[in-house]
Amino acid sequence: MNHQWKNYFKPWILERGRTYCRDNCVTKLIYTENEIQAKVEGSEEYCVEIQLSDGMPVDMFCDCPYADGGEKCKHMAAVLFAVEAKKTFLSALSVRL
């Protein structure tokens, strides 16, 4: 996944998502070639699902009120930051092995 996904989000939403990721609010992360699923803990626990095509998000869903109107939310951004961080960690780990 490249960094182009960040263009899907308003700057302040992206920053809030980064904070949620940094604060370890993303849990139960499942990442496959075609889909990402996770829970994000904030004021409540929200479910996020992201469909992928060629490693890029093509459809995103979150059950928070903000995303209910079709907006991209901080929970979606947090999950994508978490996937990016996990892939970076695994890549660095494989280089060391």
Residue ranges of each PLM-predicted region?
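Long, low-complexity, compositionally biased intrinsically disordered regions
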Residues: M1-L97
